[in-house]
């Protein structure tokens, strides 16, 4: 084996520099500079695709969190950046990791209603049974906020429990009626839930069914769907 003091000569020129020789002799070749904590999270929260890609290439953890425990991928979901979510999921980000408020990348979709981002989160094989701080799945807030296409996608593309009851005693169907405005979006959501087999007989903690709530609130179109 060659001695480390030997230099490779090409055309009589010494090609091994003193600096490299020193690094070899001490066993400490240059290492990449560590990525400062928080940079990846900030880039993800801003939907900065270029920044996230660069930081991941430099060795940043795809599961970096902020002070509230929110992960970078959850922040990217709230930012509505599908490409940022794609990069983080491909790098191994945990889409199930929940923050101090019990939100995560999948549950956040019930709030945002962004189906393009859902496509990327599903690549991470999320546990669709996890619940938020109200004890609800992603379907429930999607239903009450009037996110028609998200409700459709969750019903068509996941195994989410359509009749899950949250801590308030409400299913997605109940919440679509109680917290909805009775308008076209919530009418369509009620149709989707009923067509997918939602149990219309499940009442709230007082025993009132979705139909009874719709009648009490004067939502005639929804009454006609549920009756």
Where are these regions (language model features)?
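Ankyrin repeat structural motif
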Residues: 48-56, 81-89, 113-122, 147-156, ...
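Ankyrin-repeat inter-repeat connecting loop/turn
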Residues: 62, 95, 128, 161-162, ...
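C-terminal motif of bacterial Sec signal peptides marking the signal peptidase cleavage site
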Residues: 25-27
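Leucine-rich solenoid repeat scaffolds
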Residues: 194, 200-227
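Bacterial signal peptide processing site
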Residues: 29-31
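Ankyrin repeat A-helix N-terminal signature
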Residues: 42-47, 75-81, 108-114, 141-147, ...
């Amino acid at each position: 084996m060659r001695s480390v003091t030997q230099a490779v000569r090409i055309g009589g020129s010494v090609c091994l520099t003193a600096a490299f020789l020193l690094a070899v002799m001490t066993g400490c070749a240059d290492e990449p500079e560590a990525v400062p904590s928080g940079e990846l999270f900030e880039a993800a929260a801003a939907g900065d695709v270029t920044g996230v890609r660069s930081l991941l290439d430099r060795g940043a953890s795809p599961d970096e969190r902020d002070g509230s425990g929110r992960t970078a991928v959850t922040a990217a979901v709230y930012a509505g950046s599908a490409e940022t979510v794609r990069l983080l999921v491909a790098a191994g980000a945990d889409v199930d990791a929940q923050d101090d408020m019990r939100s995560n990348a999948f549950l956040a979709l019930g709030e945002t209603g962004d189906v393009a981002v859902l496509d990327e989160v599903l690549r991470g094989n999320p546990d669709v049974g996890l619940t938020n701080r109200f004890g609800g799945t992603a379907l429930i807030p999607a239903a009450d906020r009037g996110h028609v296409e998200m409700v459709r996608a969750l019903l068509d593309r996941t195994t989410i429990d359509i009749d899950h009851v949250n801590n308030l005693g409400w299913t997605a169907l109940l919440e679509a009626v109680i917290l909805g405005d009775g308008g076209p979006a919530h009418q369509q959501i009620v149709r989707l839930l009923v067509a997918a087999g939602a149990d219309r007989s499940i009442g709230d903690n007082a025993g009132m069914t979705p139909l009874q709530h719709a009648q009490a609130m004067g939502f005639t179109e929804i009454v006609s769907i549920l009756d």
